[in-house]
Amino acid sequence: MAAETKALIFAANILTLPTFMRLPLFILILAFTFTSCSKFAKVQKSTDYDYKLRMAEKYYVAKKYNNAQQLYEELFPIYKGQPQFEDLFYKYAYCSYYLKDWLQAENLFKQFTEVFPTSQKAEEMEYMRAYTYYRQSPKAELDQTNTQKTIGLMQTFINTHPGSTRLKEANDIIDKSREKLEQKEVKSAVLYYNMGHYLAAGIAYSSLMNNFPDSKNSEEYKLQVIKSYYLYARNSIDEKKAERYEKVLSECNDFTDRFPDNPLAKDVERYRNLSQSNIKEIQNEQAKKTD
């Protein structure tokens, strides 16, 4: 934790002290903060670049990333092409990462691999670039562009570095990202169903099965397809009901083929029987009309 941050926390704690004790301590904190800022200002003004680089390293090690970042940025054009530049670039990129400036960090990690493609740190930078997208991935309800980019870049990393020690981490992140995409689609399907848009719900649940064939919830999605199409058929105009109940039967048969001896088979059988009964009733009504 940076000294300035500790000082601010300490200042907040002072407010709980008796009034007569607060002023001396506030003065002490202000003096400490002013001294720290004054010292950094002197470093910035220095024209001794080696000294500034040493101080940047010192701030970096002390986790004062904001100070380190400012110095590295000033030194960037000075050391470009020099032996120190690779390490400077590496730490400059990480400053943005530790400051949670994900967009800047992603850009710098990418640039590092372009400037130093044969560096021993290039593999790490490729991984970190993908990881910054993962850190930007929002809740399932929101746009999942960054989640999709995470999956794409992590998969590229795995393909490019099959012997990397980071493979397990990369695969775990892909799995978590895919779970989030799946969750987003589930929420959409549930919303359609709850709103009574049963055709849209049936299509959405079918898409879930196609998009996530290895999902542990595939059987439940298939049952929801059946339920959605059944309710769609039941609420249809008379002329369309029979063919839509046939669609339910087709989905029931598909469930049996895909998931034999599944515990949900009883529910599927109920919708099969209901659909068959309704089709038979429709056929009987049609037969009466022709008599």
Give the ranges of each region predicted by the language model.
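Acidic, polar-rich low-complexity tracts and alpha-helical solenoid repeat scaffolds
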Residues: 11, 25, 34-291
